Amino acid sequence: MTGSCCGSTFSSLSYGGGCCQPCCCRDPCCCRPVTCQTTVCRPVTCVPRCTRPICEPCRRPVCCDPCSLQEGCCRPITCCPSSCTAVVCRPCCWATTCCQPVSVQSPCCRPPCGQPTPCSTTCRTSSC
């Protein structure tokens, strides 16, 4: 089947049951098919013929998505309520006990476990 991508870009590619589709209509940052929208962006294994970059810069500053909605998408976090200023590409909700978000609106700017976190306010200190 041929699916249409969000925004003004339409995809004529159909591979594995999904089209090369941005994460959302408002903010096309990631490129992944509709059948692989559960974790981090992995178009290399889901859509080999994807024509968009894996992590495009967003056209405008957008805060990190709430947990479990569009986790793993690259988002500039300049407007997130934290001290982070870099662009990260990590899941918004970690499934481990190392660093759990305080609330669903926490920014997804958490480094791997065991490293100093620049976003200590977004993680439970008792669990990190």
UniProtKB/Swiss-Prot annotation:
GO cellular component: cytosol; keratin filament
Signal peptide positions on this chain: none
Keyword Hydrolase set for record: no
Region span, 10 X 5 AA repeats of C-C-[CDPQRWG]-[APRS]-[CIPSTVD]: 5-112
Keywords: Keratin, Repeat
Known partners and oligomeric status: Interacts with hair keratins.
Record family assignment: Belongs to the KRTAP type 2 family.
PANTHER family: KERATIN-ASSOCIATED PROTEIN 2-1
Role played: In the hair cortex, hair keratin intermediate filaments are embedded in an interfilamentous matrix, consisting of hair keratin-associated proteins (KRTAP), which are essential for the formation of a rigid and resistant hair shaft through their extensive disulfide bond cross-linking with abundant cysteine residues of hair keratins. The matrix proteins include the high-sulfur and high-glycine-tyrosine keratins.
Protein name: Keratin-associated protein 2-1
Taxonomy of the source species: Eukaryota, Metazoa, Chordata, Craniata, Vertebrata
Name of encoding gene: KRTAP2-1
